[in-house]
């Protein structure tokens, strides 16, 4: 079986790792296409090294740009790649511009398309990611769902016959890496004591960074928190803050460049909790036993809220009280699978091979 994976953003590299490893025992051919959507070394190269992912076979190098420019550049470059490699499956991951570009290229050239992490829904149509994931699901020949909730969404949209519940591949990676780094001291910026309370934060979504006043209110609230905040500063955040004249190095804030995946897992494992607008980090916080406060009105990972480990808080006026809340009762629930989703994914691709 020949699988062509299309990735381009940090969360996709994490999802790619267990798939790349799971394809090896069966002797399957795996072509990795990196679109270049995340072009910063801290957002790309380090993940391939840390997670032992083979180097990409193809690098499109599209770089930054508006949604239209970026997606169009990927589409323009992808046709030749698919025609050259002619895979049995085109596998796309998550909900980025790389996802929708890969999906459109595959279906227009009549290559079988599988969508990993299918069925997630925020029901917020202002999110570009929501359009990417919905359109990709409806284009896909095979929808690989991470949770029962995602399966339910697919069934309601009439996609049940081509949907399979495989579990969440990020859980495979997160649990494996956590076991490796649990006893390691986290790599933290100067001024943060890993043995004392601290928070981990990421802010990168357009709704929180494009409006200078919204961004300023979030940064002010984080800076006013009573314990240090390790701010993993996404390039988008750094750029928007600089343009708006917002100082990220003040009060409780301890900004640092994005960490490699093992370092990020260690930082969250030892933290008091997480404050984020990221989708993946909400779930990782749950898996690592860190209470999460999500600066959004909705989440795709509703299980984290239902089980008491995640609080949605789009307003930041009472942020301190929320993030310092008591730790919830530990949960034995495993809504994201048993850590073997990649194996289930490969088996499902084989079963549905044309």
Residue ranges and their predicted role:
Residues 60, 145, 255-257, 310-315:
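Short acidic-hydrophobic, aromatic-tinged amphipathic segments that line or gate anion-handling sites
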Residues 38-42, 61, 139-211, 332:
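A nucleotide-sugar donor-handling region in carbohydrate enzymes
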Residues 81-88, 193-194, 270, 352:
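Glycine-rich phosphate-binding loop signature in dinucleotide/nucleotide-binding domains
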Residues 4-7, 13-24, 47, 59-158:
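Active-site and donor-binding regions of nucleotide-sugar-utilizing enzymes
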Residues 92-93, 143, 264-304:
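A donor-sugar binding/catalytic signature common to diverse glycosyltransferases
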Residues 37-40, 45, 65, 182-270:
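Donor-nucleotide binding loops and adjacent catalytic segments primarily
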Residues 48, 149, 311-354:
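Leloir-type glycosyltransferase catalytic cores
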Residues 286-330:
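Nucleotide-sugar donor-binding patch of glycosyltransferase catalytic domains
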